[in-house]
Amino acid sequence: MTPADLGDSPILLDTDVFSFVVWSRGPAAMYEPFVVNRLWVLSFATVAELRYGAIKAGWGPTRLRELDRRIRLCVVVPGTDAVATRWAELNAKFKDQVGMNDLWIAACALSQNPVLPVASHDHAFGMIAAEFNLPV
């Protein structure tokens, strides 16, 4: 997928891509063309992973507030019945191949109308894309 393929669509960021771009680390430059001037969407699972990582790393109040501020700039897809149904379908297919939170992230993207493209640094989303028509 190229940035032009996205048109003006919002994009769902997985945890790694959000972290790369927000904190300007790792391969952030690789993802910037896909995310600049676009509405960012996060899965509730991504929000949980981000907060867990910050707590585990011992972030202080200032960094935690900054993380919360960055998350509030995004639309967060909650864990709805539609998301749970998509997760069940994905888990039935990929249980031993894809991590649980990646399945939740994909389920959030697939449960939207239209389906949201996903920016991910994880090869697992390629497997999901091939089976479930998920743009990555």
Label for each model-derived stretch:
Residues M1-L42, G53-D68:
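Short, well-structured N-terminal submotif of metal-dependent ribonuclease cores
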Residues L13-D14, S43, V98-G99, D122:
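Histidine- and aromatic-rich ligand-binding microenvironments
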Residues P27, V47, L64-L67, A84, ...:
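A general structural signal for well-ordered alpha-helical segments in protein cores
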